[in-house]
A protein has these predicted regions:
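Conserved glycine-rich Rossmann-like NAD(P)H-binding loop of the short-chain dehydrogenase/reductase
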Residues: 40-52
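Non-catalytic terminal and boundary segments that flank Rossmann-like NAD(P)-dependent oxidoreductase
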Residues: 1-18
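Conserved Rossmann-fold cofactor-binding substructure of NAD(P)-dependent oxidoreductases
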Residues: 66-87
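Conserved Rossmann-fold NAD(P)-dependent oxidoreductase catalytic core, especially the SDR/UDP-sugar
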Residues: 87-90, 94-147
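N-terminal Rossmann NAD(P)H-binding glycine-rich loop of SDR-like oxidoreductase domains
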Residues: 18-34
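Adenine-nucleotide cofactor-binding loop residues
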Residues: 51, 73, 95
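Conserved small/polar residues in nucleotide/adenosyl-binding loops
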Residues: 149-151
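Conserved residues in the N-terminal Rossmann fold of short-chain dehydrogenase/reductase
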Residues: 47, 69, 109
Length: 151
């Protein structure tokens, strides 16, 4: 296995504008904290949770952060949020199995159609890099949630 230095990875973000869908979730926040240690130009956080955005902005207090209220199911909103972005991390998803079991169509709208919207917005804006954060549970789906992330 080839070993890649941390500085080489960090250099990928130098002077870049990064957008994170689901940026106020656990993975989004961890990614934001890591990116703030680089020379990233700006980080845009796209999420539906206004309270988490306010808490995150207050706790991190970094001028490179920009917060966008939005939903991956809203393609026109993605088109606006993705303007001027170099790199996208797609971490937005419904992830709690019982919620999706009782609300399968919402799961489809967010996890499947929302992901397609992210791809469409990336293509529309010629985003140079798009990274989808997934889970190992998608390999052998056993329920509605796992079937949705398997697609």
């Amino acid at each position: 296995m080839t070993k890649i230095s941390k500085s080489k990875i960090d250099n990928q973000f130098t002077n870049k504008t990064v957008l994170i869908t689901g940026g106020t979730g656990s993975l989004g926040q961890a990614l934001t904290n890591r990116l703030l240690k680089t020379k990233v130009k700006a980080i845009r956080i796209l999420s539906r949770n206004e309270n988490k955005q306010v808490e995150m902005a207050s706790s991190l207090n970094d001028d490179r952060l920009r917060f966008f209220i939005g939903d991956v199911r809203d393609l026109p909103r993605l088109y606006r949020a993705f303007q001027g972005v170099d790199i996208v991390f797609h971490a937005a998803a419904l992830k709690h199995v019982p919620v999706i079991e009782y609300n399968p169509f919402e799961g489809i709208k967010t996890n499947v159609m929302g992901s397609q919207n992210v791809i469409d917005a990336c293509l529309y804006h010629n985003i140079s890099k798009a990274i989808c954060i997934g889970t190992d549970k998608a390999v052998s789906p056993l329920n509605t949630y796992l079937s949705l992330i398997h697609i």
